[in-house]
Amino acid sequence: MSYAYRFKYIIIGDTGVGKSCLLLKFTDKRFQAVHDLTIGVEFGAKTITIDNKPIKLQIWDTAGQESFRSVTRSYYRGRAGTLLVYDITRRETFNHLASWLEEARQHASENMTTMLIGNKCDLEDKRTVSTEEGEQFAREHGLIFMEASAKTAHNVEEAFVETAATIYKRIQDGVVDEANEPGITPGPFGGKDASSSQQRRGCCG
């Protein structure tokens, strides 16, 4: 299937926060309560629609273990979007966010769009991180923020789509130069030049 743009994502965060579950729910609409730990990097893809244009998302799901961090670092380069995930029932995963974010910004493009996801919001009775704390962290660091549940699918699609919509808007607004961002690839009938030429043709009949 052809696309207007291809955006590359990376999912990061501590082990066990539900990164692989979020990806599986988004791409396959499936939830696995017991999921093998990611060894290195896993991959998923899905095409969504933004502004009536097909956008292909290629998503790399990374291992959270310290022993794989060097592998993860090499995948930051050439990513247009990052999903930074913590578990609302495990405060230590929230406390580690600053370290993950610093590493991402050190190795990735300065124009990378980052979505902060507080996962497992279906476990409200076990919550140890408040929604307000997540909102404050996102605000302080210039991130988008959502709480989600890979189990119930709450905000899973929305998180991936909102990240893409933000990247797309930044391209259209000229904040991000698609030609100089390896994580963004105009498709066969995509890109700003294509959309503007289509508009010109439309105006001329």
Swiss-Prot record:
Family annotation (CDD domains): Rab2 (cd01866)
Disordered as annotated region, ranges: 179-205
Keyword Thylakoid included in the entry's annotation: no
Any one GO MF annotation of this record: GTPase activity
Lipid-conjugated positions (S-geranylgeranyl cysteine): C203, C204
Classification via NCBIfam families: small_GTP
Name of the protein described by the UniProt record: Ras-related protein RABB1a
Annotated organism of origin: Arabidopsis thaliana (Mouse-ear cress)
